[in-house]
């Protein structure tokens, strides 16, 4: 505990790490990234090496040609006491349009933040949605693609 105190370092835990990664838009395997979503839906198309053959290439090329039907988004959720749980339903105009994959209070941005997947036509910045948290629908707004905090990655230096 004493090592690092002179540099302002303090102990922290998994909840802090989770909050920080969600504010940055970093996705976690098995929660945010899984076989439930294609690489294009996950916004990771830049990592596809189209110059080499791979299983599922034709299906992925067809999806790329028509456009992914779902997209990952970052949401600011208008709730101050509960985070959006894993797989909370996301609503628009009275219909389920997606699900959350992660949620936490964003201490740097001072708001509840959720990552989720929604219909592609609703993935635009400013789109008003609702996230169901323990049976109550709570207003949420789609944020600009990218980190909510430290967009230029200036804080993430070792």
Annotate the PLM regions.
Residues 1-158:
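Conserved, structured C-terminal
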């Amino acid at each position: 505990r004493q090592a690092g105190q002179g540099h302002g370092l303090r102990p922290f835990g998994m909840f802090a790490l989770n909050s920080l990664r969600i504010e940055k838009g970093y996705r976690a395997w098995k929660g945010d990234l899984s076989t439930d979503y294609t690489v294009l839906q996950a916004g990771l198309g830049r990592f596809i090496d189209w110059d080499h053959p791979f299983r599922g290439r034709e299906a992925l090329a067809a999806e790329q040609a028509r456009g992914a039907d779902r997209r990952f988004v970052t949401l600011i959720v208008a709730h101050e006491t509960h985070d959006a749980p894993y797989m909370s339903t996301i609503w628009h105009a009275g219909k389920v349009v997606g699900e959350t994959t992660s949620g936490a209070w964003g201490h740097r941005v001072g708001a509840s933040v959720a990552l989720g997947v929604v219909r592609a036509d609703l993935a635009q910045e400013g789109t008003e949605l609702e996230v169901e948290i323990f049976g109550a629908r709570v207003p949420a707004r789609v944020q600009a693609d990218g980190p909510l905090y430290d967009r230029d990655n200036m804080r993430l230096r070792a």
